[in-house]
């Protein structure tokens, strides 16, 4: 049973609404057969993992801000483009008080991703800034800051965005030194599955939301009923990481304590994932957290019209469904909505991208209730949003 920091229901001054949503997906979609043309061959060899991973993850097309060995957009540009899509002449960009962004894949360590996005937007004013660094939950963690600021009366509006630029991290050139080193050691020259696996899972894009203290006068809005996050890093060691190597005791040694030679030989800056840990814990801990939220908010299946699960792979749909049933929250297939096969796994942008498609394709009607689930495997964090269409 999850123990919450406070079992006292939070009383905010006023409700908060998601009134506009926007996404930006770079270039044309890339099919499964075209992936290695964009990402390249490591050591000149086709990936052994590619066909297995793609067969399980259910992704048919995805988007890359990368063509012919060069970037077409930076992460900052992806995020800025998605945010610009929220605004028009009737509601200018300068109307926002807060910029709340999250990403797994910034271009630089310092300054923050949010600072770079603020600069790229060309807003003719200073804004309050929150820039969350993590993986899939980072955008929602930033969103919570903005929600609380508006709810408490500190701000009137905020732009939130999740964005990812993973293609350059996944390009074959990033793994060549390690593959060449393995060949010299008379090994097979194939990089480890924990690294190659993610090359066929992650892709690029951005999605943004506008938060305001009042709903749209014309058209639908999402009212945020509640938003909860949690970390289980006190219980579980790291599962997905970059810029470090994982030691036998489960600890990490960061890039700044490794030699420059090791950075390339071990592909230290590649994204790696312990798939055994992922399978053992990611669904179970998410269900544990949700069970506590069900009790806290009296959440039952009949109070959910749409369930939006962020999944890295369709492989997890069955385990998630079984876990929900085990905690007493059976959600029928017709209530599930996700766009993973069409847009791919876009990390921190994925939750917003589902909400954007659900709203902007007119699938929802006033009164619909939506549960959004965002698991993060990095060190097992989770976010749940419960929304009502108003």
Where are these regions (language model features)?
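Condensing-enzyme catalytic core mediating Claisen C-C bond formation in acyl metabolism
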Residues: 2-72, 188-280, 375, 386-390
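Short beta-strand segments
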Residues: 20, 102, 133, 158-164, ...
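Short acidic, glycine/serine/threonine-rich loops at helix termini
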Residues: 30, 110-112, 143-144, 169-174, ...
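Claisen-condensing/thiolase-fold acyl-transfer catalytic domains that form or cleave C-C bonds
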Residues: 72, 76-80, 105-107, 119, ...
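Short glycine-rich phosphate-binding loop at a beta-alpha junction
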Residues: 94-102, 301-310
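Acyl-CoA/ACP chain-elongation machinery
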Residues: 154-176, 232-240, 313-314
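Short, flexible helix-coil linker/hinge segments at the edges of structured domains or between repeats
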Residues: 167-192
């Amino acid at each position: 049973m999850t123990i919450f920091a406070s079992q006292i229901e939070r009383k905010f001054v006023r409700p908060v609404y998601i009134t506009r949503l926007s996404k930006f997906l770079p270039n044309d979609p890339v099919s499964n057969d075209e992936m290695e043309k964009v990402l390249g061959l490591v050591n000149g060899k086709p990936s052994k993992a590619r066909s297995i991973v793609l067969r399980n993850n259910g992704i048919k097309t995805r988007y890359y801000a990368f063509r012919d060995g060069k970037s077409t957009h930076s992460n900052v540009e992806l995020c800025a483009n998605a945010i610009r899509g929220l605004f028009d002449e009737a509601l200018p960009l300068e109307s926002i008080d807060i910029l709340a962004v999250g990403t797994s894949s910034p271009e630089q360590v310092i300054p923050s991703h949010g600072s770079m996005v603020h600069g790229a937007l060309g807003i003719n004013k200073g804004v309050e800034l929150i820039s969350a660094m993590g993986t899939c939950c980072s955008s929602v963690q930033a969103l919570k800051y903005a929600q609380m600021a508006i709810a408490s009366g500190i701000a009137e509006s905020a732009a939130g965005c999740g964005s990812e630029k993973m293609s350059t991290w996944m390009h074959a050139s990033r793994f060549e030194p390690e593959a060449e080193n393995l060949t010299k050691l008379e090994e097979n020259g194939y990089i480890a599955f924990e690294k190659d696996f993610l090359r066929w899972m992650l892709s690029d894009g951005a999605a943004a939301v506008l938060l305001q203290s009042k709903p749209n006068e014309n058209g639908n809005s999402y009212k945020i009923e509640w938003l909860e996050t949690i970390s289980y890093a006190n219980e579980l060691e790291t599962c997905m990481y970059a810029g470090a190597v994982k030691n036998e005791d489960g600890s990490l040694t960061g890039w700044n304590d490794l030699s420059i030679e090791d950075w390339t030989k071990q592909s230290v800056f590649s994204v790696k994932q312990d798939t055994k840990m992922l399978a053992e814990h990611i669904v179970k801990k998410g269900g544990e957290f949700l069970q506590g939220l069900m009790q806290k908010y009296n959440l039952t299946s009949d109070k959910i019209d749409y369930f939006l699960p962020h999944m890295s792979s369709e492989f997890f749909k069955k385990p998630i469904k079984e876990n929900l049933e085990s905690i007493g929250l059976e959600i029928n297939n017709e209530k599930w909505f996700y766009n993973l096969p069409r847009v791919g796994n876009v990390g921190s942008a994925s939750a917003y991208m589902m909400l954007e498609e659900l709203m902007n394709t007119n699938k929802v009607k006033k009164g619909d209730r939506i549960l959004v689930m965002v698991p993060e495997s990095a060190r097992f964090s989770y976010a749940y949003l419960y929304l009502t269409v108003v």
